[in-house]
Regions:
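Hydrophobic faces of well-ordered beta-strands that scaffold small-molecule active sites
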Residues: 15-19, 40-42, 70-74, 97, ...
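Non-cysteine beta-strand/loop elements that form the S-adenosyl-L-methionine
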Residues: 42, 96-104, 163-173, 226-229
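Active-site beta->alpha loop and helix N-cap motifs at the rims of alpha/beta catalytic domains
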Residues: 69-139, 144-152, 161-162
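Active-site beta-loop-alpha junctions enriched in small/polar residues
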Residues: 20, 45-47, 75-77, 102-104, ...
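Glycine-rich, positively charged N-terminal anion/phosphate-binding segment
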Residues: 2-5, 20-95
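Glycine-rich tight-turn/loop motif centered on a GG-T
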Residues: 106-123, 174-186, 248-251
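Alpha/beta catalytic cores of nucleotide-metabolism and tRNA/nucleoside-modifying enzymes
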Residues: 1-3, 7, 11, 15-16, ...
Length: 337
């Protein structure tokens, strides 16, 4: 995988943390970058600036301290509102603006945003033209292969994007109707890669170093967008980068290393969100980290009732201490990839 450029920025590698609402907040972005991601993208920010006064929106728009280049995803269906939102985020420190035309969630699509936009190619063009003209930073785009299997217009949208001045394109290998079911279709991504000259990033079902290599070979993509597989496993970027570079698989992480990363992540969440919201946000992340370990279900039932930061950290330490002593986890005390 050769070096990838997005406008003036050369990425450390072509492995990108996909934007995920409720997941890719600043603590998670910073952690994934530390653990090997070449670029990390913010949670989706609505283009409706009248909603920016909520605490959730304000937290999503904190870019100071983010690893550079700072990529911020915006979502909406009105060209002028998206252009204004892009301009405002650049003023707040965004160095790359990413437009969401890939989210399949009903609450997004029902507002004629996300992958719903793929139904209207003229509107797609108007949005891309408006946002590119509004800012002097690179604009990127995330799409799906189409609205449904009968309307797979990803190739057409990719060409529209290139002509509009989009500087990189991420393609999830499913239609909006597919949601996350079935297998990702990499042949369509390969066709898109052949049809445009801008960088193309493949997305969908990339959950191991071996799968990463397969997808790169199958699509010819310039890089990979990794989302759900990084939840509870932010070191997947390091694993994939090492495998692609050397052909060798890194040893599974020691439990002690998983504990260290998780506690660091917890502390960052508690600081970023404050004690009350931080405790709530931490619960899902802890569930993801521990999902494959024995006793995790019982632990989560107890952990999710905890109400303060110190108790959360103490319980995580206790969980790992018990696993460390347990023969169930094996002599090496490693976490399977």
């Amino acid at each position: 995988m050769s070096a990838v450029r997005i406008g003036p920025y050369t990425l450390l590698n072509g492995l990108i943390l996909a934007p995920m609402a409720g997941v890719t907040d600043q603590p998670f972005r910073q952690l994934c970058r530390q653990l090997g991601a070449g670029l990390v993208v913010s949670e989706m920010v609505t283009s409706d600036m009248s909603l920016w006064n909520s605490r959730k929106s304000r937290l999503r728009m904190i870019h100071e301290g983010d690893p550079e280049p700072r990529s911020v995803q915006i979502a909406g269906g009105d060209p002028q509102m998206l252009a204004d939102a892009a301009r405002a985020n650049v003023e707040l420190g965004a160095q790359i603006i990413d437009i969401n035309m890939g989210c399949p969630a009903k609450k997004v699509c029902n507002k004629a945003a996300g992958s719903a936009l793929l139904k209207d190619e003229q509107l797609v063009n108007e949005i891309l033209q408006a946002v590119v003209a509004a800012v002097d930073v690179p604009v990127t785009l995330k799409i799906r292969t189409g609205w449904d299997r009968e309307n797979k217009n990803g190739l057409t949208v990719a060409k529209i994007a290139e002509q509009a001045g989009i500087q990189a394109l991420a393609v999830h290998g499913r239609t909006r109707a597919d949601l996350y079911t079935g297998d990702a279709e990499y042949d369509t991504i390969a066709q898109i890669k052949q049809a445009v000259s801008i960088p193309v990033f493949a997305n969908g079902d990339i959950d191991s170093p071996q799968k990463a290599r397969y997808v790169l070979q199958a699509t010819g993509a310039d890089g990979l967008l990794i989302g759900r597989a990084a939840q509870g496993r932010p070191w997947i970027f390091r694993e994939i980068e090492h495998f692609l570079r050397t052909g060798e698989t890194l040893p599974a992480l020691q439990l002690s290393e998983v504990e260290r990363i998780l506690l660091e992540h917890l502390a960052a969440l508690h600081v970023f969100y404050g004690d009350v919201l931080g405790v709530r946000i931490a619960r899902k992340h802890v569930g993801w980290y521990l999902a494959t370990l024995p006793g995790a279900r019982e632990f989560r039932a107890h952990f999710n009732r905890l109400q303060d930061t110190e108790a959360q950290c103490a319980n995580v330490r206790e969980f790992f201490s018990e696993r460390d002593k347990s023969p169930e986890t094996g002599q090496e005390k490693e976490v399977a990839a």
